[in-house]
Amino acid sequence: MTTLRLLISDSYDPWFNLAVEECIFRQMPATQRVLFLWRNADTVVIGRAQNPWKECNTRRMEEDNVRLARRSSGGGAVFHDLGNTCFTFMAGKPEYDKTISTHIVLAALNSLGVMADASGRNDLVVKTPDGDRKVSGSAYRETKDRGFHHGTLLLNADLSRLANYLNPDKKKLAAKGITSVRSRVANLTKLLPGITHEQVCQAVTEAFFAHYGERVDAEVISPDKTPDLPNFAETFARQSSWEWNFGQAPAFSHLLDERFTWGGVELHFDVEKGVITRAQVFTDSLNPAPLEALAERLQGCLYRADMLQQACEALLVDFPEQEKELRELSAWIAGAVR
């Protein structure tokens, strides 16, 4: 009986793909070796312990319909589009060894005519006339009896967009999370013009089979039919939730300041698990009462643009004469925290 399992996703939904990965990892027999191949449409994927407001330009992501997905492994933030091929290798312990999966990916690249080397703990690099360039980054997760290694291969990713979404706005954001390192990267199409996702998947699959000396048929995972994976619906609901993707952020503080025609405003937030635990306001407005009331109302509020807007607009009942100021304030706060 084979110990290998090969899964290929035909979904571009990052929450779907990460939920599939999580379910397979939790439920696989300890004797199984798994290869899961997938890719995501426009998404910023952050590490388990990262702060999205620090790592990402969340406002631009929202404007461009780019999703945020928090993975279960550590490490930094990356931008995925359909120019990335994603891979996940899973195995039980003691057999799990990320050097084996790294070797398989390097063998796959070699079969395509690309000589790459492992660099540091997480990267694969190729030599170019301009120096070493990263073509793959990885992250890892281990539990008591199993582990996985997942990563991306840059085929034809839009590298300019990568810079757009991973460069946060210059805000006064003092955070305790991990800051991603911006790396020099290159697409494999520079070395192999015309290379496709399907060709790369085939090369990785063949290297996987060759290493273990076995072959299996691929299982295609599709959102058109709910995957036959125990607890998939619950896992997908969690993976796609605001509470997981944003609310798991480490504690951080945020200072917003702006000058309006009616006065200057400074708002100080302390945020834990996506909830405002403390809000302070400073202003030289001649009528500070609405702002003082807002600071009280914001404590316990989710750190989300729509929730902050609701808190501002709720004050219109008590301060109707300040409607113009409150609507200006509401629009500014919502824009500043996106």
From Swiss-Prot:
Coiled coil: none annotated. SUPFAM superfamilies: Class II aaRS and biotin synthetases, SufE/NifU. (R)-lipoate binds at residue 134. InterPro entries: aa-tRNA-synth_II/BPL/LPL, BPL_LPL_catalytic, Lipoate_ligase_A, Lipoate_protein_ligase_C, LipoylTrfase_LipoateP_Ligase. It catalyses: L-lysyl-[lipoyl-carrier protein] + (R)-lipoate + ATP = N(6)-[(R)-lipoyl]-L-lysyl-[lipoyl-carrier protein] + AMP + diphosphate + H(+). The keyword NAD does not apply. ATP binds at residues 71, 76-79, 134. Its EC number is 6.3.1.20. One of its GO terms (molecular function) is lipoate-protein ligase activity. One of its GO terms (cellular component) is cytosol. Keywords: ATP-binding, Cytoplasm, Ligase, Nucleotide-binding. GO terms for biological process: protein modification process. It comes from the Bacteria. Residues 29-216 form the BPL/LPL catalytic domain. Pathway: Protein modification; protein lipoylation via exogenous pathway; protein N(6)-(lipoyl)lysine from lipoate: step 1/2; Protein modification; protein lipoylation via exogenous pathway; protein N(6)-(lipoyl)lysine from lipoate: step 2/2. Pfam families: Lip_prot_lig_C (PF10437), LplA-B_cat (PF21948). The keyword Cytoplasm applies. It is found in: Cytoplasm. Monomer. In the transfer reaction, the free carboxyl group of lipoic acid is attached via an amide linkage to the epsilon-amino group of a specific lysine residue of lipoyl domains of lipoate-dependent enzymes. Catalyzes both the ATP-dependent activation of exogenously supplied lipoate to lipoyl-AMP and the transfer of the activated lipoyl onto the lipoyl domains of lipoate-dependent enzymes. Belongs to the LplA family. HAMAP family: LplA. This is Lipoate-protein ligase A. It comes from Salmonella agona (strain SL483). The gene is lplA.
